[in-house]
Amino acid sequence: MPPNSKSKRRKNKSKQHNKKNGNSDPEQSINPTQLVPRMEPELYHTESDYPTSRVIKRAPNGDVIVEPINTDDDKKERTANLTHNKDSMDSASSLAFTLDSHWESLSPEEKKTILRIEKEEVFNVIRNYQDDHSCSCSVCGRRHLAMDQEMERIYNTLYAMDKDKDPETNPIKFHLGIIKELQISKNQQQNDLSSTKGEVVKNFLSSSTVGSLKEEVLHFKQKQLSKQEQAHNETADNTSLLEENLNNIHINKTSSEISANFNSVSDEELQQKYSNFTKTFISSHPKIAEEYVQKMMMYPNIRALTDDLMNSNGQGFLNAIEDFVRDGQIQASKKDDSITEDEASSTDLTDPKEFTTMLHSGKPLTEDEYADLQRNIAERMTNAYDTASKKFKDVSQLEKELFTRFMSGRDKKSFRELIIQSFKNKFDGELGPSVLAATLSSCFSSQSKDTSLDTDSIYEDEDEEDYDDYSEYAEDSEEVSEYEGIEAVEKPEHDEKSNGIRETLHLSYDHDHKRQNHPHHHYHSTSTHSEDELSEEEYISDIELPHDPHKHFHRDDDILDGDEDEPEEEDENEGDDEEDTYDSGLDETDRLEEGRKLIQIAITKLLQSRIMASYHEKQADNNRLKLLQELEEEKRKKREKEEKKQKKREKEKEKKRLQQLAKEEEKRKREEEKERLKKELEEREMRRREAQRKKVEEAKRKKDEERKRRLEEQQRREEMQEKQRKQKEELKRKREEEKKRIREQKRLEQEKLQKEKEEEERQRLIAEDALRKQKLNEEQTSANILSAKPFTENGVGNPVSSQSHPNMTNYQEDNSCSINDEILKMVNSVAASKPVSPTGFNVHDLLLPSTNNQMPAMEQSHLSQPGNQNNHFGTTTIPNALDLATKSSLQTENNYLMNSQTLENTSLLMHNNSSPTKLLPNDFGLSSWGGLTNTMSINPTCKPPVIQTSEMKSQAHKSSPQATMPSFGLPNGGTHRKSFTDELNTLTSMLSSSGFADTSLSSSGFPPSQRSVWNDQKSSFSGPSTAGNFNNSSIQSGMLLAPTLGSVESFPNRTSIWDSSTTPMMNKSELSGRNITSTAQDSPAFMASNIWSSNSQYNSPYLTSNVLQSPQISSGVDESHILDSIYNTYLAISPQDSLNPYIAIGTLFQNLVGLNLDYSTFINKLISMQGAYNCEFFTDNNGSITHVRFARQTPAGHSKGLLNQLFSGLNDPTATPFTSRPHTSTGASFPIASSTTQTS
């Protein structure tokens, strides 16, 4: 590094000035390296751990150097390691030696595997090359013969020729014989004097002389450098020019001296002189010295170099080596077609880019990476050069190789500039410019010489061993005879085995003697111009056959093509001439010879690849093993270091612990002394206080005894008071319990009396209701019989009834037997104390189940109308009074709201002063009757409404002065009165044998599950119901028949049921003006065509769509009223003997017809009642709700009992479904007490 401070610059200038003036002072002439001793780091604490990367010292030139710490043992070990490394580097100076060692380490089986070459493998090598390169030479077929076909023919011909010579020849033996021929041809061409100086240098020494020659060359180089350091004072540029001139002059002088010496000295004297020199400087072994002298006498260049070493201490030798490298570089840079093979080989050998590409796994380096590599190598070589010993230290073989290649490569100028700059930066202050130039030149020459000598000698050993292995394989393959004959011929020609298989692998130096230049320079063994095929084995085994894209070499000893100097363009234009030349100019012998050489090269290439593959595989295994060993060693060192640190920490802890114990012991002694003194003082004080304490305790004891006596007396008084208080509290508690028991008993007695009274009143009302209903039924029966007799006798029906009345089915409901049993008990209790009705009516029969009971066949009366679609007259349906006894008051109200719209004669619903002409729209149609043999309905559970009070009937007759229909649609004619007595007797007998419904009727007159007392099994009946209960109906389940009457209006009466004329009706606009909502006008209903038909089943749907709800009715029903109605209906129809029975969802929905809810709304209401009413559901597999259950608890707004709600609507004797409207409020329930008062 250049000095930065002023003092250093002054010091350097003074040193240079002293050198220029030639100061004779012995102190000043001493080398600075002798004045500054070598500095070594000192360790003050040998047991301490010093970081190896933190020890810093100063170099002799002032630089700061960081080095690891070396103890005495480490120094000895390092010295031994350096000695061992030096010996190993001398014995294995290149990768070729490693490859040779690898071949020796292979087992015989592995060697056989490598040497076993098949025919297809040889042709694959040739084909792979042919795919990448196209050629038009004679060997390749002059563009019209396939290379593989020609080579296969040549191969078969050569194999047949060898087979004729030796019948035991096989492909493997044939391949080895071809390689042996290549070795023999190599030995024959070694005496060629046209080889270059570079090849002479590489071949003139054996492997045993390499180490000694390297040391001698370095010794001569150091002496020369010391002389040049004292002699040259010029600048670096002038020195370099002068050296070039001197080198040229020296070479001329050397040649002249050599010629003079040869003339003046005899051969014997020269041989003796050379022998002495060789024994002294090269090797003391006589055989080696003799071999060297023999080779030296054969090659004049070697003699010239030896004379230079003897006379001028090797200066001429170094200059010769440098000139050789320089000449090779100049020749490699020329792109002349006549370039020799040796020059191209030298170029390839010294091409640093190719070498770095091979080291980089076949990937070429970028320009930046290549420049960084050159700079690092320059700095490394500069730092490794020691000015004291004049040697390079700690330089690896790879660094030496890279340095040599960079110095002799195409970009050597730039690299040398880097070297010069690096040397100037480090040694400018110590060495002069001329010394720097000489040092660089000698270093480069030394490195080049070492590399060339190492490579040549190692290849000699390697090839010798390879030859032995081939011979061993031949013996194992029973092919010894041929190879023994070949060896017998070869041994007289060459004494050593250095010309074995290495001659096959070392092909780069045979090209000068075995080949002549072909116009296309075509050679088929390697393709060094291809970046993909350039690999490490080409460098190691020195098989670097030059190949430009249009240069191919062929060996032809006797024939030279006449087109050697012609350019490639002329060859392309003269393709036809070349084909003629191929056909006529070359004979079969030449083609066979060329083919044999191609096969030789292909086999050589295949052997190279196999050996390198085996080497890389073994190297990979060794690397893995080495890595594992290094990891294990690293772990061991780390573990030892940790153990050492742990021991040190434990030692420190023990030392600290002992110190702490000593401190604690001293402290304890001081504390004990203090405690002793303190105790003495305390004892004196305690004795004084003890006397005083005794006096005080005596006085205190007396006071305590007095206080204790007073406390005992106080405690006894408090215990007596507490005992008296507890006695008083016990007496008071007993009195309170007695009073509470008496009050509870009175309350229970009152409740019992109240329940008895309510039960008696309820039974009385039930009995009265039953009697009243029986009476009404009898009267209605008689009236219906009289009105139906003319129809039966005449057999005439209404021809248009099917167009004006819808098909209706009766309700179905499953009633609990518990309610019937309860009602039966109440009726029996009342009936037991009252006389039986004079009509022979049996109340017990009314409460029997209606499953198998037969009732008289009497259908509901109809109003016969002509076929006018605007007719609004309908049938009158009267509810059965018995149904009121089993339904709750709220159920009665809801059903009334629904069924009140089906009444035709609204005079039954109005006040007595109302007009008798008020009629209902014809929304519901009832089936006709045909006689006593007709069935009541297809559904056996259908029951007809047949109840009408005599008061209502009389009102209907009094209010109309003209001839009108009776309230049940029967005529007033007296022609049928004559048979009334007979009909009445028949009905009475039937009633006596039949029971009324076991279930209750709804307030609208349509009993859900009661059999008719007038029908037989074939009569048909229809009434308002859900769509799911219509017979043969397509109406979906859950559809409701909504009420259609908002207010009752009057309609004109008919004069006769047989009248075909139609009385003009009010139009829709008049109805809408009067707030009448009728769906019959928009949704026509259908009836059977014949009301007298005995088989009257309906085939048409009753309604085609859902009927809209009347806004007048829906406005009076709020949300809470709907929820209460659902809950009360559930309590009314659920059995009383079970706590929480499940009720079918359809049954509960059918009993809520009066609420005008569709099925989806009904389900939503039930879901909303889960929280407030404790509602629970039961679903099927599809998730649909099928049953519902309510907990029997009183919900919000339901404070009355079940029986109170069941009979709240019957408390008023005058309030019937035909005389009053039901309540629509939801906030209050129906009181029983007030009803009882009114009844009484």
From Swiss-Prot:
Keywords for this entry? Coiled coil, Cytoplasm, Phosphoprotein, Stress response
Q: Name the PANTHER family for this protein.
A: LD36051P, STRESS RESPONSE PROTEIN NST1-RELATED
Provide ranges: composition bias, Acidic residues: 457-487, 558-587
InterPro entries, per the entry: Fungal_stress_NST1, NST1
Natural source organism: Saccharomyces cerevisiae (strain YJM789) (Baker's yeast)
* Name of the protein this chain belongs to: Stress response protein NST1
User: What are the start and end residues of every segment in region (Disordered)?
Assistant: 1-76, 446-593, 634-744, 953-980, 998-1029, 1214-1240
Quaternary state and interactors: Interacts with MSL1.
Biased composition of type Basic and acidic residues is found at: 39-48, 488-513
**Compositionally biased residues, Basic residues:** 1-20, 514-524
Query: What spans are recorded as compositionally biased (Polar residues)?
Result: 25-34, 953-965
